[in-house]
């Protein structure tokens, strides 16, 4: 059975899920997960089943608790969508630098990891998916596996940013993207167009030369923006990224 370990590194709280065979030795790929790894906790039993049945190679999962997700998971500042929510600070690049310069070195030094790009992933849901895609474009030399579940593609300017990237030179990157057909169904703002923005992003990535066999894009009919669907697709994303 997988084992949770909790620790604090430089003021950042980490929740690590070590795979079932970790105590037996060996080195493992690592995936850094936004929102404290909540999506991994929601499907930890299913992950163990995937391990036992050989569907998924064992990996170390590192959930990172965000001090302020509206700041840490956004690439540039934007005003709040509504008066009841806070604005977006746009500290995403600094957050990713913290992962690369502080958290990843700690994990690689204290756990038996495979630390190269091909064995290092980053994943997240919603805004966590957005910052994971941003990591794919800004730091492809660090993160070779990227999973974006229901990424907040509505974020103003991000689709244009994605379209402006040179995806043909990122052929060593492996990318998984998921979205549900009913994302944003009850929203009255830009979030209502979540599905359209995600589809447009996928078209842009492929049009800019990214190899189609390196991108797994999944839509679920009836899928909404909640943990039920995030947790369902998280193990499938890991399976595709690491097999």
Describe the function of each predicted region:
Residues 1-243:
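Non-catalytic cap/lid and distal C-terminal segments of serine-dependent acyl enzymes
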